Amino acid sequence: MRHPLVMGNWKLNGSRHMVNELVANLRKELTGVAGCDVAIAPPEMYIDLAKRAAAGSHIMLGAQNVDLNLSGAFTGETSAEMLKDIGAQYIIIGHSERRTYHKESDELIAKKFAVLKEQGLTPVLCIGETEAENEAGKTEEVCARQIDAVLKTQGAAAFEGAVIAYEPVWAIGTGKSATPAQAQAVHKFIRDHIAKADAKIAEQVIIQYGGSVNASNAAELFAQPDIDGALVGGASLKADAFAVIVKAAEAAKQA
């Protein structure tokens, strides 16, 4: 049985005070939680501080992006080796905000995926369709294309130990969310698509839902068989709300 993972993407939010306070509150709120893996991805400059604040807890660290290169003259970038060295394990790639604002292509994201795997880190591959693509009935086509960028270059084996986050772009930060049934249908499609290449790996891969996940809709989402957790944005900045989501995942997958 897949072990659920709830990960907080803090995006461009944080300060030394905020990191210490939020992690301390998370530790209190998550006391006794063992049935759901928990990770947080602060801005890069706060990963080390968050790691120290989380020391001795079950909270794992992640990052929001990575560069293709391991070292060299690449101003402003952060390598997989650096993230590994500082203690980050779950690395978000392909987020719609990176695809949109930084023009990241499927091919570039697939290369980042490969670099992370080579370094023993866990890629959290974000995929999902825009509102226009959704309305045009292209959800499955878009998700398949984004997955195939990895499948066709690295094979299904690359997804072993990796995480996929289905984030419909129209639901990110908008307050809108796919219904549990809509989300489940896409998650099942993603799993079935990978299963065409390798059924065993498809069954094992964690597929998170992201897109305005909050304390009120989490339990219903996690009740779906192919939703294995969540990649949480705004709600991850509030310890109590994030903890409700984590506990909902734990309860749903133990049921």
Swiss-Prot record:
Compartment(s) where it occurs, according to its Swiss-Prot or TrEMBL record = Cytoplasm
Can you tell which superkingdom this protein's organism belongs to?
A: Bacteria
* Coiled-coil regions listed in the entry: none
Q: For this UniProt record, give its keywords in alphabetical order, as a comma-separated list.
A: Cytoplasm, Gluconeogenesis, Glycolysis, Isomerase
Which amino acids does the record list as binding substrate?
A: 9-11, 173, 212, 233-234
Q: Which reaction does it catalyse?
A: D-glyceraldehyde 3-phosphate = dihydroxyacetone phosphate
Residues spanning the membrane: none
In alphabetical order, the GO MF annotations are: triose-phosphate isomerase activity
- PROSITE patterns cross-referenced by the UniProt entry: TIM_1, TIM_2
Q: Which CDD domains match?
A: TIM (cd00311)
InterPro entries reported for this sequence: Aldolase_TIM (IPR013785), TIM_sf (IPR035990), TrioseP_Isoase_bac/euk (IPR022896), Triosephosphate_isomerase (IPR000652), Triosephosphate_isomerase_AS (IPR020861)
Q: Where is the active site?
A: 95 (electrophile), 167 (proton acceptor)
Q: Which E.C. number(s) belong to this protein?
A: 5.3.1.1
Query: GO biological process: any one?
Result: glyceraldehyde-3-phosphate biosynthetic process
Pathway, according to UniProt?
A: Carbohydrate biosynthesis; gluconeogenesis; Carbohydrate degradation; glycolysis; D-glyceraldehyde 3-phosphate from glycerone phosphate: step 1/1
Q: Name one GO cellular component term.
A: cytosol
| Residues of the signal peptide | none
The record ties this protein, via HAMAP family, to: TIM_B
Instruction: Fill in the subunit field for this protein.
Output: Homodimer.
Spell out the family assignment given in the record's similarity comment: Belongs to the triosephosphate isomerase family.
Please explain the role this protein plays, according to its UniProt record. Answer: Involved in the gluconeogenesis. Catalyzes stereospecifically the conversion of dihydroxyacetone phosphate (DHAP) to D-glyceraldehyde-3-phosphate (G3P).
| Protein name, as recorded | Triosephosphate isomerase
Q: Which organism is it from?
A: Salmonella typhimurium (strain LT2 / SGSC1412 / ATCC 700720)
